[in-house]
Each structure stands twice: as C-alpha cells, then as structure tokens.
C-alpha cells in the first residue's frame, strides 16, 4: 500500500517530457512546412514521419501502454494494427497509381472497343 502511494505522489516527469516532445515535434513540422524549400512531397513525407513519431510518443507517454501487466501484448496489438492500416493505405495508393492509365486510350475509342471489334460488322 505504501509503495502505491509513493508511486502516485511523485512529480509526473514522464508526462512533462512527453508534452514537451510533442510540442517540439509540432514546431518541427511547422518549420518544415513553412520555412524550407523542399518539394511538397518531401514536406509531406517528413510531416507524416513526425506525425507517426508523435502518435507513438503519445501512446507510450500518455496512454500508459507499457505500464500494465500485459503491456507488451498491447504494444504488439497496436503495432499489428498500424501495420495493417499502412498495408491497406499503401496498397490502395499503389493500385490506384499503377492502374490509373489502364482504361485510357489514346485513339479516343472507349475502353473495350478493340476487344469487341468482331461485333462491329453486325450493325442493324
């Protein structure tokens, strides 16, 4: 009982450090967006990187993911969820980008016109 009250009576350094790091990451993202001459895509990748770092920081510092007895299971489940979300998003972007021009035809004919040319002689 005395150990539990000693744990809760100390100053929340972990929360203060997490808060300061969150502010620093936000200001870094703002600096990259406003004050650098990088391309838009480079800025986006850097800002998304800062966002993922900040999300992990908030989960670890404020959500107390590793402090329970099954903390490693919670971290593993969260990482698996992030992996699934990243695979779905990047896979969707890859499919959209790779097959964007699949239906486009330079000759002006609608898609599927060349495949159905054997039926063109059956006009009524």
From Swiss-Prot:
Pfam families: COX4_pro. The chain crosses the membrane at residues 16-36, 44-64, 78-98. One of its GO terms (biological process) is aerobic electron transport chain. Signal peptide: none annotated. Keywords: Cell membrane, Membrane, Oxidoreductase, Transmembrane, Transmembrane helix. One of its GO terms (cellular component) is cytochrome o ubiquinol oxidase complex. It is found in: Cell membrane. It is a multi-pass membrane protein. It catalyses: 2 a quinol + O2 = 2 a quinone + 2 H2O. Its EC number is 1.10.3.-. One of its GO terms (molecular function) is cytochrome bo3 ubiquinol oxidase activity. Belongs to the cytochrome c oxidase bacterial subunit 4 family. Catalyzes quinol oxidation with the concomitant reduction of oxygen to water. Major component for energy conversion during vegetative growth. This is Quinol oxidase subunit 4.
């Amino acid at each position: 009982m005395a150990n539990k009250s000693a744990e809760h009576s100390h100053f929340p350094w972990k929360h203060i450090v997490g808060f300061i790091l969150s502010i620093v990451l936000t200001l870094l993202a703002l600096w990259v967006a406003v004050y650098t001459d990088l391309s838009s895509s480079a800025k986006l990748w850097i800002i998304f990187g800062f966002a993922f770092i900040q999300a992990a920081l908030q989960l670890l510092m404020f959500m107390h993911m590793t402090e329970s007895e099954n903390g490693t299971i919670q971290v593993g489940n969260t990482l698996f969820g992030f992996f699934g979300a990243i695979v779905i998003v990047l896979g969707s972007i890859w499919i959209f980008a790779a097959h964007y021009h699949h239906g486009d035809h330079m000759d002006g004919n609608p898609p599927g016109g060349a495949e159905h040319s054997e039926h063109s002689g059956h006009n009524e």
